[in-house]
Amino acid sequence: MGVQVETITEGDGRTFPKKGQTVVVHYVGSLENGKKFDSSRDRNKPFKFIIGRCEVIRGWEEGVAQMSVGQRARLTCSPDFAYGATGHPGIIPPNATLTFDVELLRLE
């Protein structure tokens, strides 16, 4: 499956991240059963990463790159676009499909 992007709230439709740009997002990550495993919103601190530097899972690299500034979307990432057969011990089980509610706040 890779990554599926479903828009929750439209962005500006014009400003998309480019390779090498820093994106600033708020997100909530959930397992298939709906259990939340991580949230920048709970910490009240947006998360930043650089597009194209493999700093995040592939589902984020490809999914967030399709979003425009201001957009909020649900990213559904198959295991091969998330943490794969290894998972993240104690947090994400092996071969887990993950869902992220991501809002692209701005580019830097």
UniProtKB/Swiss-Prot annotation:
Keywords: Cytoplasm, Isomerase, Rotamase. It comes from Xenopus laevis (African clawed frog). It catalyses: [protein]-peptidylproline (omega=180) = [protein]-peptidylproline (omega=0). It is an enzyme of class 5 (isomerase). Its EC number is 5.2.1.8. Keeps in an inactive conformation TGFBR1, the TGF-beta type I serine/threonine kinase receptor, preventing TGF-beta receptor activation in absence of ligand. May modulate the RYR1 calcium channel activity. PPIases accelerate the folding of proteins. It catalyzes the cis-trans isomerization of proline imidic peptide bonds in oligopeptides. The lineage of its organism: Eukaryota, Metazoa, Chordata, Craniata, Vertebrata. GO terms for biological process: amyloid fibril formation; cytokine-mediated signaling pathway; heart morphogenesis; heart trabecula formation; muscle contraction; negative regulation of protein phosphorylation; negative regulation of release of sequestered calcium ion into cytosol; negative regulation of ryanodine-sensitive calcium-release channel activity. This is Peptidyl-prolyl cis-trans isomerase FKBP1A. Belongs to the FKBP-type PPIase family. FKBP1 subfamily. The gene is fkbp1a. The keyword Cytoplasm applies. Its main location: cytoplasm. Inhibited by both FK506 and rapamycin. GO terms for cellular component: cytoplasm; cytoplasmic side of membrane; cytosol; extracellular exosome; membrane; ryanodine receptor complex; sarcoplasmic reticulum membrane; terminal cisterna. It comes from the Eukaryota. GO terms for molecular function: activin binding; calcium channel inhibitor activity; FK506 binding; peptidyl-prolyl cis-trans isomerase activity; protein homodimerization activity; SMAD binding; transmembrane transporter binding. Residues 20-108 form the PPIase FKBP-type domain. It is found in: Cytoplasm.
